[in-house]
Amino acid sequence: MSRLCIFLIQIYRKYISPLKRPSCRFHPTCSAYSMAAYERYGFFKGTYLTLKRILKCHPFHPGGYDPLR
């Protein structure tokens, strides 16, 4: 399942992301963070970390440097 998620993120980064203006307030970007989470922790924890990160991505959060731990 992790490989499928990584594949879908790669599709997003290659075809959808270039059509949008840059809007991620974090470094690394949410998609890069998610790919790293799936590669490092597998499907379940990777999904948990991805959802947690995406829920922080809103105008009221300061963003900034937020590496995968």
UniProtKB/Swiss-Prot annotation:
SMART domains: Haemolytic (SM01234). Belongs to the UPF0161 family. NCBIfam families: membrane protein insertion efficiency factor YidD. This is Putative membrane protein insertion efficiency factor. The keyword Membrane applies. GO terms for cellular component: plasma membrane. The keyword Protein transport does not apply. It is a peripheral membrane protein. It is found in: Cell membrane. Pfam families: YidD (PF01809). It comes from the Bacteria. Keywords: Cell membrane, Membrane.
